[in-house]
Amino acid sequence: MYKRQNLVADLIEVFGDPIFQDQQIPERELKDLIAVSPSAAGAVRALYRAYSSIRDDAEALGHQPAQREKTSATRNATDAIEEVREYQERQSNYFEAIESAAESLRSELNVTPYNLAFALVDNLRSRHSVETKVMPATVLQNTLRQFKNHQQRLLLSEMLPVSGRTFQLGVQTAFIEQGELLDRTVEKAELKTADGPGILKSSLANYFAGALMMPYVEFRGAAQELKHDIELLQQRFMASLEQVCHRLTTLQRPNQRGIPFFFLRVDKAGNVSKRLIPSWQGDSAGKFKFARFGGTCPRWVLHDAFASPGRILTQISTMPDDTTFFTFARTLDPIGSWQYGGTAQFAIALGCEMKDAKNIIYSDGLDLKGKKPGVPVGVSCRVCERMDCSQRAYPPLHHRLRTEHGVRTVSRFQFEQ
């Protein structure tokens, strides 16, 4: 069952839509609905998601009936992506069977981070008769990895850095050697969408590759030793920034847990392309509420990262319920070239509750005792009660607009209390 505190946040956001402006439903009633009938509450959320998706498609396409079939396919894909995200959250983004498979292979290969890629190439050749070749970008163009099954050839793009080549070798190894394990895990998930199983299988293969590059016990120990210094972890495990940050969110093994980080990746427009929120019982990261039907709060440091590419930015953030989080964010280095997709820009954020911030190197020198208030952030403008926010894009639910021509405040909106 989808975690109740997340469902409450989702329904608050749902009923923050202007279409419900005449129905002022307090949070208490939403909690009552979830307590009495969680399935019905989940159905309301699913119905709104479908409505929201159709509305967004209609606004984007305008009067283009020829595009309706493509729009339906896009909507189905979006639903599948969200379904997989929620399944990963229910699992706390931790998969013990895949961890064990990765540990077994790494032990058999007897490798270090510095020769893992070569060992995987040899393993594919000796066990599966698969030859690996790095190809010019002019040949593969935008493709980074291509497996030619009939030729037993794995082609990797020269645009991939060492960490990317190792990762893609791990992904293809997962598909070839661990196909049955991946299929069993997908089957157990009991996903409802048509595209969900395929998306989840790819995600699990990526998980295997990350576990292969950064073995659980060793990586967790290094993260604690280095106070989660991302750059040093990159060097120690020959991994990329995103690979390291993603791996940190998977450290949820019972009795060997790491910090319960949440992770987000966005583009310059604020579109969320990756979201990982561990949600095991008692977890703090699960309390961080993300907008699931719109953009994130513009006051969050994640959006500032694009103005300082390559730098790690930090922020102590306070939600409207006074829950405080520590977040650090950075842009990702693009993979590719000017010709082949290398101009795409993304930023990622990793965050945790304040009680864990002292164990992160990037919090050194910050006021962690609460003497100074954190930066006020919210879920989305529709459900945020911060009346004086200078970055507010929409008026909040349950507050009538007040027009005073003789008064102008820092916010473009004025409201009745």
Pin down the residues of each PLM region.
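Short juxta-domain linker segments that transition from a proline/glycine-rich
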Residues: 4-417
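Active-site loops and adjacent core secondary-structure elements that bind or stabilize anionic groups
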Residues: 1
